Amino acid sequence: MPDHEVQTRKSRMLDDAQEELNITVAVRCRGRNEREIKAKSSVVVTVPDVTGSNEVSINTTDEVGIAAKMNSRTYTVDKVFGPSADQSLIFKEIAEPLFDDFMKGYNCTVLVYGMTSTGKTYTMTGDEKLYDGQLSDSAGIIPRIMFKLFDALEATDSDFLVKCSYIELYNEELKDLLDESHDSSKRLRIFDSSSMNHSSRASSQSNSPREPEVAHNGFSRRRQRPPPVKANRMSATKQQLSESGSGIYVQNVQEFHIINAREGINVLQKGLKHRQVASTKMNDFSSRSHTIFTIMLYKNCDGELFRVSKMNLVDLAGSENISRSGAQNQRAKEAGSINQSLLTLGRVINSLADKSIHIPFRESKLTRLLQDSLGGNTKTALIATISPAKINADETSSTLEYAAKAKNIKNRPQLGALMMKDILVKNISSELAKIKSDFLSTKSKDGIYMSHEHYQEIVNDLENCQTEIQESKRQIESLTSQNNLLLKDKKASQEVTELQNSKIKKLQSTIEYLYDKIERQHHNETELATTIHKLKEALHTMQGSLKSYETHELRLQNDIKEVLYQGITSYRESMNQHLEKVKVSMLDKNLSIKENINNITTIFDDTLKSVEANGSDMCDTLVKLIKETPSMYLKEFNETVSSLKSELSSYSNALTNKLTEISEENNHLREYLDQHLFKNSTQEVLDLRMESVYQKVKNDSDQLLSKLVSMVGAHVEESRTLMVNSMKDTVNEIIDNERSLFQPIRDRWIASCDNINQCDASHQNFEAKSTSGLDKLKELSDASLKSSEDAVNKAKHRTDSFHDFVQKLCCDQSLKKQMHDISDKHRMLEDHFDDNVKYFKESSKGFEDMDCSIKKIIHEMSPEVGDIKSVETLMERINARTFSPVRPTGKTPSRQVLKNAITSKASSRSMSPIKTLDTNVRIISPVKRGTIEFGAEGPPTKKVR
């Protein structure tokens, strides 16, 4: 080979080693399956129907519409395929670019990752059966790669060799799916090819089945090709070191040589028959293991050199929720192993994405097998399969998280190793010679015989196994001794645990008892708070009643004054006006009878001299009686005054009774405030409570901390002293604050009592004066009535005596005329008298109207029945309620931090209802009530002027 070609190849390899590529990540979302449709689970994943956008959105909240879009999480990947994307599109977009690199000599890997029942196996294998020698539309990536591989190889003239293997990782155990012998001695082991020694070839087993008809030279040409071969055995160590650039080597795995796509499909179907599958509640054909289908390509690239490239097609088992899948016993163990390996794979992805120093590849066999594919020297594509249903939202989010992080992993792809044709032929020839010698030895003897060299290899293997057995025995003995020590430690730990559990149970019972006490205390405080609220309402009601009574009293006094002063004054003025009218009318008309009497006297001068004195006296007396005799108005006035007196007396009695009741209520309230409000047994209750808490703390301290009795006792004494002093100071301060806040209220109540007493005294004085005035009026009216009756009797007597004399004079015409004139004038006087009587009757009606207005005012100004009933009901409820001191419940000890969970109590226990009360009650002065409004609900608020 020329030197410049060697230099060019070396520089190309260095450039390839320095190039870094990210892992290609694709997301495939299937449609909802029958189980999800039956469960009526909504779609929470937003993807294109086929492909297009590179973003996947998932809504993990219960919101819809714009809010759901705003709160949804979006993941960006390289490719996104929706439910309508078919198998051919997946292969064309994801697997075909890697296949082209595989043909160029790069190592490539395709991984399918996701939860169970999302279509991983369908994506990787699909329908692997052939129909008339052709693939179906549902065929997956592996069958399509098989056909495309041989189509591409047949289109070239170069020599090639294709081998394939199929391994399974089940419960962290490797298994060869193409091995039908099930030989337990051929356990698959994982080695790093860089750490293997060339001298260990004898310990390596064959990678192909021992079948005599499978030997051939291993080459395949396009035109001259030997008969088909099923399998060929190659040397273990030297071949792997020279063939592959990978650092991971699986010992004892069988590799089958295939010459066309049909044989590759048969190998795939053979392995699928041995794969572990089972039925769960989430999937009828659930894969219970991870599988890796590997295709090895030896392709002639330059004369006698062959380029070795490898493609790993990985079908990972799906993660599953054991409670939802219904896995039990063996299935639960399988699910645990699957989840554990996938969890390790997730940690590896996170470490690689975060560029951590330590990558936990060796924590799981799965991650060790994928060490080259993740962060190694291969080109890798990851297909994440997800479900769109809401019931799988958590698993979908986890899958998308891993896929998004895997996108940041960088690999350094390198071309596969070069192998000389002579080395490849020499390895195949040595394998054929070894198989031939074993076959001849077996054929010439009755039993199974082998050559000396082969026997020596087996002896060496036996010695190595014996050495390993001895080392294992020593390890077993050391582990047994360690196990015994651990058992002793475990027994001691169990005893300590039982002791601690008993203590914890006692503490839990104590805590429950204390919680019950706290509940009782909370109940008592709630009742006390309710009582305080009711007393506040009663206080506000009483204040409103006092205010209404004051307003009613002022209005009543003003209305009575207005009625009495204005009514009587107007009546007096109208009376004077009427009397003046009568006087004027009497003076205007010539009503004097002196002229008539003089005429009669002159006429009867001779005959009436004997009775002149009596007639004159009678006339004078009559005129005097007419002027002085009271009319019917005086009688009605007397009756009206009597009725007014009785009404005033009844009103005075009613008002006195009401004021007496108010005064008694105020006296009772003052007595309660002075004797009972602040003289309760708060201090005694606190002392008893503190003493019981102190005894409880002391007893618990003696039981739990017996070795620290003296220190705990001193601490408890000091704590008790501090707590007692602080509680006493707090109680005294509360009582002083309550007294200082209530003192203005008490002063105003005392002042209101004084005002009520003054009002009562003024009312009694007014009643006495009005009664005395009315009595004087009645006496005067009685005296005038009596004198009028005497005068009337005298006039009647004289009239009777004069009647006889008048009869004697009735025959005289002139006398008749004069008498007629006198009668006319007398009639006129009677008319005037009747007018006066009518006027006085109308005046009496005015007095009646005045009396009705006074009664109406009294009725309107009387307190409403509803207010009286509400106040009486409230006072009856307060008097009927018996207040008892709060019972002591003991002191709550400090809660210990326990290892096991204790049921948390409701947070309302720690919130005392007494603390929520507003004790800053403000009593509004009557002087300032004009500037303050009382709301319908809530405390008084000042007006903004």
UniProtKB/Swiss-Prot annotation:
Residues 193-208 have a biased composition (Low complexity). Residues 22-409 form the Kinesin motor domain. One of its GO terms (molecular function) is microtubule binding. InterPro entries: KIF11-like, KIF11-like_kin_motor_dom, Kinesin_motor_CS, Kinesin_motor_dom, Kinesin_motor_dom_sf, P-loop_NTPase. GO terms for cellular component: cytoplasm; mitotic spindle; nucleus; spindle microtubule. The keyword Nucleus does not apply. It comes from the Eukaryota. GO terms for biological process: cell division; initial mitotic spindle pole body separation; microtubule-based movement; mitotic spindle assembly; mitotic spindle elongation (spindle phase three); spindle elongation. Residues 450-562, 634-675 form a coiled coil. Gene3D superfamilies: Kinesin motor domain. ATP binds at G114, M115, T116, S117, T118, G119, K120, T121. Elongates the mitotic spindle by interacting with spindle microtubules to generate an outward force pushing spindle poles apart. Following spindle assembly, CIN8 and KIP1 apparently act to oppose a force, possibly generated by KAR3, that draws separated poles back together. This is Kinesin-like protein CIN8. It comes from Eremothecium gossypii (strain ATCC 10895 / CBS 109.51 / FGSC 9923 / NRRL Y-1056). The gene is CIN8.
